[in-house]
């Protein structure tokens, strides 16, 4: 909502290719050839950079899987994605949960960028995905 109008207009019709491979570079920047080959087998998907929720609110589809913007040189594309991710993750837009025993968090996965911070392996983590009333298309 707060993105400058000129920026909104500039990105309104852009499409982003998302890939599982791209997300792995955040976890393992120095993947082996075999790891890269494995992740490259996953299909890519082209999505609009700006997605409109059925409520009318717009979201930026900029998760870790965002690889490049169609029609832009790779360097320019990745710089744009990084700049928009920096904008979207300013402290004023971030909710960081301080977990306590018994907590349950729910969010609309279609319009929310979410991350897990590193946590102790022995702390336990249980996640379920529930679809309450269908999925919204990302066309």
Question: What function would you assign to each model-found segment?
Answer:
Residues 1-104, 109-139:
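Non-heme Fe(II) oxygenase catalytic core, chiefly the N-lobe of the double-stranded beta-helix
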């Amino acid at each position: 909502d707060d993105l400058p109008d000129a920026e909104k207009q500039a990105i309104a019709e852009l499409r982003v290719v998302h890939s599982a491979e791209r997300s792995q570079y955040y976890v393992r920047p120095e993947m082996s050839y075999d790891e890269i080959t494995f992740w490259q087998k996953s299909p890519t998907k082209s999505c609009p950079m700006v997605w409109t929720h059925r409520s009318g609110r717009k979201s930026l589809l900029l998760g870790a899987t965002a690889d490049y913007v169609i029609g832009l040189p790779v360097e320019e594309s990745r710089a744009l994605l990084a700049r928009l991710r920096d904008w979207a993750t300013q402290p004023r837009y971030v909710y960081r949960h301080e977990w306590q025993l018994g907590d349950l968090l729910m969010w609309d996965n279609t319009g929310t960028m979410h991350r897990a911070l590193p946590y102790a392996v022995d702390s336990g983590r249980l996640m379920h995905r529930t679809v309450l009333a269908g999925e919204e298309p990302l066309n």
